[in-house]
Regions:
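ATP-binding/phosphotransfer module of carbohydrate and carboxylate kinases, centering on a glycine-rich
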Residues: 1-67, 77-82, 97, 101-107, ...
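A generic structural motif
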Residues: 29-30, 89, 158
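Conserved NAD(P)H cofactor-binding loop of Rossmann-fold oxidoreductase domains
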Residues: 74
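A charged helix-plus-loop insertion that forms the helical arch/lid used to bind
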Residues: 82-91
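Short loop/edge segments at beta-strand edges and connector loops
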Residues: 109-113, 117
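Active-site glycine-centered loops adjacent to acidic/histidine catalytic or metal-binding residues
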Residues: 112, 138, 299
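Glycine-rich phosphate-binding loop of actin/hexokinase-like ATP-binding domains
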Residues: 127-185
Length: 305
C-alpha cells in the first residue's frame, strides 16, 4: 500500500491507497492561515505526520506495510525540495528529509497539477486521449500537458506554471511578483473573492456562494461576476489551445464544485470564432473524474517520461 499527500493552498489531504489506485482511507485538515510565520513549514510537517499516524492507527496498519509516500504540492519542486510554492510562501524547503525523520520509507515529491494529470490519464477523464491539457483551478491555477500520449516535462524542475502566464499587461500584482497572471483572474479563489466583495461578506462559505449563484433575486449581479470570470478564464485557455491544440481539456480542483454553473458558459465562450486562431480546434472541455482526489492518487503512480 501507499500513502498519497495533496498539499493545497488552504488544506492538506492524505489518502491510503491500495494496489488498484483506490483510496481506502482518507483524512484532511485545513491549514493555518498564517503562511508567513517562521515555523509554518514545521507546522505543515507536523500536520502531515499526525494525519498519516491517524490513518495507520485507524486501519491498524504498520508503517512497514507502506511502500511509498507521494507528495503533490503546487509550485516548483525537485526530488527533495519545495523550490518555490508562492501561494504557500514556501521556498527551498527539504520536505522529504523532514518527513523521513518520522517515516523512513521512499518519498516522491511532484507538482500537484502533474500528479492530478497522471491520475486522470491512468484512471480518469484523460484515459482515452493522447493530446490533452489538464488544469487544476483552485486557490491558484496549475496545469500539465500530454502530447502524443507522453507527459510534457521540463528538464530541470517539476512544474508547468500555467497560472503565471500573463493575460493582462500591468494587471493585478500576483504572489509571484509579476502582474496580470492568469491565476489572479481565473482561479476559484478570485471567483469567490469577487462574489464576497460584491455582497460585502468575506465570510461566505462555498455552500452559501453556490446558493447565491442560483438565487434569481441577485441574477443580474451574479451574471456580471460569472461573465467577467468566464471572459478571463477563456482568454488563458484560448492561449493554451492555440499553442498545444489538445483534443480535450480536463479541469479539476475547486472548479468541479461549480461546473453546473460555469462549464457550459465556458464551452460556449470558447466556441465563439474570435477566441481561437483555428476555430476548428476547439477541444472537448470536461471535468476531472477523480475530482479532488486526483492529486492524492497521482502522487504515488509510477510513470515513464
Amino acid at each position: 500500500m501507499k500513502i498519497g499527500i495533496d498539499i493545497g493552498g488552504s488544506h492538506v489531504a492524505i489518502g491510503l491507497i491500495n494496489g488498484n489506485g483506490k483510496i481506502i482511507a482518507k483524512e484532511d485538515q485545513d491549514l493555518n492561515n498564517d503562511l508567513r510565520s517562521k515555523d509554518y513549514c514545521k507546522k505543515l510537517v507536523n500536520t502531515i505526520i499526525e494525519l498519516i499516524t491517524k490513518i495507520l492507527e485507524e486501519k491498524k496498519i504498520d508503517i512497514k506495510e507502506i511502500s511509498l509516500i507521494g507528495i503533490a504540492i503546487p509550485g516548483t519542486v525537485s526530488e527533495t525540495h519545495i523550490i518555490k510554492a508562492k501561494n504557500l510562501h514556501i521556498k527551498d524547503f527539504n520536505i522529504v528529509s523532514e518527513i523521513n525523520k518520522y517515516f523512513n520509507i521512499p518519498i516522491v515529491l511532484r507538482n500537484d497539477a502533474k500528479c492530478s494529470a497522471i491520475a486522470e490519464k491512468e484512471y480518469g477523464s484523460l484515459k482515452k486521449y493522447d493530446d490533452a491539457l489538464f488544469l487544476t483551478i483552485g486557490t491558484g491555477i496549475g496545469g500539465a500537458v500530454y502530447l502524443g500520449g507522453k507527459l510534457l516535462k521540463p528538464k530541470k524542475y517539476e512544474g508547468f506554471e500555467i497560472g503565471h502566464m500573463v493575460i493582462k499587461k500591468d494587471g493585478i500584482k500576483c504572489n509571484c511578483g509579476r502582474k496580470g497572471c492568469f491565476e489572479k483572474y481565473a482561479s476559484m479563489k478570485t471567483f469567490k473573492d469577487r462574489i464576497q466583495s460584491k455582497f460585502n461578506n468575506k465570510n461566505l462559505t462555498g455552500k452559501e456562494i453556490k446558493e447565491l449563484l442560483t438565487d434569481k433575486y441577485y441574477q443580474k449581479e451574479i451574471e456580471e461576476i460569472i461573465d467577467e470570470y468566464i471572459e478571463d478564464l477563456s482568454i488563458g485557455l484560448a492561449n493554451l489551445i492555440n499553442i498545444f491544440e489538445p483534443e480535450v481539456i480536463s479541469i479539476g480542483g475547486g472548479f468541479v464544485h461549480f461546473k453546473d454553473i460555469l462549464l457550459e458558459k465556458l464551452v460556449n465562450k470558447l466556441n465563439k470564432e474570435d477566441m481561437l486562431f483555428n476555430n476548428q480546434a476547439v477541444p472537448k472541455i470536461i471535468t476531472a473524474k477523480l475530482k479532488n482526489d486526483a492529486g492524492i492518487v497521482g502522487s504515488v503512480i509510477e510513470y515513464k517520461d
